[in-house]
Every structure is written in C-alpha cells, then in structure tokens.
Amino acid sequence: MLKFLKINLIFFLFVIVSYSSYGNSEISDPYEKSNRTVHEFNDKVDVYFLRPVSVGYSLLPNPIEDGISNILQNTGEPINFTNYILQGEIKNALSSLMRFVINSTFGLFGVIDLADKINLKQNDTDFDKTLEKWGAEEGNYLVIPFIGPRSSRHFASSIVDLAINPLNYLLKDEDNIIRVTPTALYAVSARSGNMD
C-alpha cells in the first residue's frame, strides 16, 4: 500500500507542476486524438457492460438499492471531512464527521441514513475542489478508460481521494475481488441513477 501511495504522490506532484504552463481558464485538450479513442472505448464498455449491469441492479428492491447507496455515501464522509479541513471549512467538516459517526453507529454502518433524518444533509466535496480553492488550474482535458472525462487536476485529485478512502485500509488484506467491489458497486449505483 505504501508503494502505491508513493507512486501516486509522484504522479500527483508531476500533474500539479504541469499546471503552471496553463494560465487560462479554458481547459486544454492536447490529447484530443487519444481522448476520442478512449471515449469510444468507454462508450462500448457502457453499452455492453455497465448499462446492462445497471439495469439489473435497478431491479433490486428499493430498500436494498437505497441501503447500498447509503453505505457508499457513508464511506465517502471521511473524504469529505478531510477535504473540508484542507479547505478551511470547519463547519462542513464537522457536519461530515457527525454524519459519519451517526450513520456508522446508529445507522447500521450507513445502511440507514439517520443523519439526513435529523437534518444533517450530505454535502460532498473532494480534493479537486480543494485544489481549486488553493488556486490550482484545471490542466489538460483527459478521457480516462472506464472513468470518463476529467481535467488533469480532477484525475490527480481522484487518486488522492482514493488514497484517503477508509475502505482501502479496511479491505487491504482481502482478495482483489473484494477490494474492488465497493468501487464497482459505486459505478453501477451511479450509472443506474443516470439511466437514459
């Protein structure tokens, strides 16, 4: 895990350094040809795999689908908390911390979103918003396989958010299939919420 974090940190720093060459507010697309190729690949993955799986997922009874979605949202609260601290938004950080504590203890590890019922609303943030607040430019436009379009800042920030996700530490000794299950569930859950 430490090697993974070191490699990602080096990549992250490389991407951040590359921002200095882009002072305008428009996102640059110097990789248009490869981005188009990856976009076509992602479309095929969506049509032949992700959409059919998401259709099946959406057939689950609503309480099960909601429970899975709630667990995934709950595991994101430590990421929200960390980023709000880095952004200097202490009130939002404490709200995220309280949501996590309440839903993890009284909400059956997040299956039930009790925090929402007592008016502690979810308010997502990520390291991309942190970097934006710190003044980092968006960088280049990238289309990432299996993920989709991102600015290079957003892509680098996704690596940081992944690194601080508590599930990585809870599942570090598990088989690969178990470690990727939350990410796969998140993708399927998000896709089923965006059916066209």
PLM region spans:
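Bacterial N-terminal signal peptides
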Residues: 8-18
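Bacterial N-terminal signal peptides that target proteins for export
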Residues: 1-9
